[in-house]
Amino acid sequence: MKEKFAALIIMDGLGIAPASDSNSVTLADTTYLDNLLKEYPNSTLVTSGEAVGLPEGQMGNSEVGHLNLGAGRIVWQSLSRINVAIKDGSFFKNQAFLDAVAHAKKHNSKLHIMGLVSDGGVHAQMGHYLALYDFAKQQNILDRTYLHVFTDGRDTPQESGYGFVKTLVDYGFNVATVSGRFYAMDRDNNWDRVQLAFDAMTLGDGPHFNSALDGIESSYKSGIQDEFIKPFIVNDKGLIENDDAVIFANFRPDRAIRIATALSNPSAAKTIYTEGKPMLNVSKAPKNIFLVSMMHYKETVKGPLAFELQTFDDLYGEVIEKNGFKQIRAAETEKYPHVTFFFDGGKEVPLANSTRILAESPKVPTYDLKPEMSAYELTDKVIAALKTGEYQTMILNFANPDMVGHTGNIEATKKAVEVTVECVGKVTDFIINELGGVAIILADHGNAEQMRDQEGKPHTAHTTNLVPVVVTKKGIKLNSGALCDVAPTLLDLLGIEKPKAMTGTSLIEKI
C-alpha cells in the first residue's frame, strides 16, 4: 500500500477505562472519536511496563511514549538502566559520581543530591536516592552531604510527599531545602517560578522551617499540596555554594534543564529558552559547581553524565528523510520536546526535511483554568501548513487530556477531552477529504480516564490502562500491540520498507 499522506495524531493522556463519574473521557462528548471507532479499523495499545522498556507495572509517560513511537522498537528506559546498575553494583563505582566526591574533597566543600522525591518513576525514583545515600556513606562524605527535595504530587497522590521525605529523613538524609515541582521543575519558561527554587537552594531566600516535615505539614495545613509547595529552607549550612558538587537525580531531562543549566553554566541560563521572556537572574549563582546529571539533559548543561545517552539509528524521522519525504512536527509548548527531541531518540538537531510548528501554551498557574490550552491555535497552524500540499507525513500532539488531567479537576479534564476530540476531528477531516491521506489516532499513555483513586481522592498521575488506536483506512484489520509498532505501521501505509533496526511490527494484519 502507498498512501499520499500518513499522519500520527497523539491524544496525550487519553486512556481506556470503564465509564464512571471519575472518567473524564466517558463523561465527555466524544462523538467524533466514537464515530471513527465505529467506521474505521481500531484496536488497543500497551503503553506501560516492559512493552515500553520500563519495569513491569510501571506506568508510561510522554517521554517514554514518544521515544518508543519514534524508534519503532522497545526503548529500554533510564529507570530500568539505573535499577540494573544498582542491582549489579556498578552504580557505586560510577565514575561521574566518584569524580563529584573527588571535587568536593579537593575543595573541602559539600556534596548535594537534588531531584524529584517520589515513587512515580517518571522523572526520578525513591530507590535511587537510597542508593546515592549508600554511595555517599561508602565515600565517607555523609557529614557534608545535603538533599534538596523537589516534591511531586503530579505523578503521585497530592499529599504523598510527606511520606516520601520521611522515608529519606529516617534513612539518614540531611535535607537542606524543599521546593514543589511547580517551581523547581518548570519547563514552560516561567522563570519567576524557577527563580524562587534556585534562590532557595543557593541563597537561602525563602521561608525557614526547623525540619522538612514541618515545612511540608505547614503547607498542607495552608491548603498547598506537594506540587505547589513554595520553596523553603531547612538548613542554611546545606546551601549550594562555590566549589560544591551536585548530583541531579532526575533521569528525565525536560524538567531538569533550567536548574541544571543555572548551576553548571550560569552564562547560558541568560539565553536558554528566553524567547523574549524574563530570564533567570544568575548574578549571584555559585561558581565552580561540579554537576553530575543522571542522564543527558541538554547541551547547555555542563558536567559529566552518570549514564550516557543511548543512540539509535533508523528512527522514523530519519527513514522519512532518507526517502526524500517532508514531515511536520507539531505541538504546543508543553509537548513540543516530545514530538521533536524525544521522538527523534534524544537528538536535538532538526531533520533537514522537517517543519516544526509550535503553539505557545497559555500562561496560567494550572491548566484546569484554561482546559482548551492552545489546541485551537495549534489546529489552525497545522491545517495552514497542510494546505501547502508539501508534506507526506506529520506527528501531531494534543496535550490537553494529560496536562489538564494532572490537575485532578474532572470537569476541566472533560472539557479538555472534548476540545481535543474536536480539534482531532478538524485535522483528520482535512487529511481525509482534502489530502486523500490517512491518520493514525492514538494516545501515548492513560490519565484522563481515571481522575479519582480508590479512596475517592484526586488521581493526578498517569495510568497503566490500554489506549485506543484507530487508522482511517477501510479494508484493513488492526492487531493489538504496543507503541513500538506505530512507526512500522506508518511506514507500511507510506509504502516504505521497515529498517531492520525497527523490531516493532506493523499493526496492519497481513492477509
Swiss-Prot record:
Its cofactor is Mn(2+). CDD domains: iPGM. It comes from the Bacteria. InterPro entries: Alkaline_phosphatase_core_sf, BPG-indep_PGM_N, Metalloenzyme, PGAM_B_sf, Pgm_bpd_ind. It catalyses: (2R)-2-phosphoglycerate = (2R)-3-phosphoglycerate. Binds 2 manganese ions per subunit. Belongs to the BPG-independent phosphoglycerate mutase family. Catalyzes the interconversion of 2-phosphoglycerate and 3-phosphoglycerate. This is 2,3-bisphosphoglycerate-independent phosphoglycerate mutase. It comes from Acholeplasma laidlawii (strain PG-8A). The lineage of its organism: Bacteria, Bacillati, Mycoplasmatota, Mollicutes, Acholeplasmatales.
